Amino acid sequence: MDAGHIPVLLHECIDNLNIRPDGIYVDGTLGMGGHSEQIAGRLTTGTLIGIDRDETAIARAGARLAPFGERVQLVHGNFRDTAAILDRLGIDAVDGMLFDLGVSSPQLDETQRGFSYMHDAPLDMRMDESAALTAREVVNTYSYEELRRILFEYGEERYAPAIAKRICQHREQKPIETTLELADIIRSAMPASALREKQHPAKRSFQAIRIAVNDELGELPPMLDAAEKNLKPGGRLAVITFHSLEDRIVKKKLQELAQGCICPPEFPVCVCGRKPKVKLITRKPIVPGEAELTENPRARSAKLRVAEKC
């Protein structure tokens, strides 16, 4: 396994996917291929479909997964299009799907990608480098109201109005070009009490802008719809989230799919005919243990939810 990349909740994911040697599995967030490597290693006649919007990730994971030969098929694409990708590959149903959401460690560590507030780089933040929208465009062209909404809704940043105002003031003088420039502007808009907090003052704002650039929350409903449509009965969905916004959407959708009869309790028999579409394997999310957190502190906010198609 790549020493520089530690897959989050690896054993918990693999155990909960109930991998069959002849099954078909989707890793919708291929990344460095850590989860995929463990899935492919458990297949004999089965197939793994690895999807990633980041072409750099496809190339790196491709080299890592090359020993598995035709058991692995890699696709440059967005996991929101999972259903269409499977249709294009002529695959109607699969035995399991895994989605590890959010920005990957390599993307954070590659300074030039512009995801990190710790190193100076052009404002980019695109997971798919062929996409048009960049963080620079968001920061320099979105209105005050749009910026305030993004910072508040996607970053849950309580100082969103002040930060959005300061961004607009600075860009009137000259465009905001780099990550450290933006981080300094954010810091300058926050009160002294906020700067004394353990968390970096730019963390929430950078998360919010990244989510906006990549439409990370908008991708979740079609991803979950694909799981409902394309999983075989007994097939499992595993989703790792890293912040409350993602987890809330995933939790709500899975609870809706798991709900059966919605008739009023006074009805003697069911007349709605509604049946559960999935069974929740994890009523509460699985979180990393202390051993994993010691090895990989970035896993601290990870939550794994698992459901099985009925």
Task: Indicate where each model-derived feature is located.
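S-adenosyl-L-methionine-dependent methyltransferase catalytic core, i.e., the SAM/SAH-binding region
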Residues: 1-310
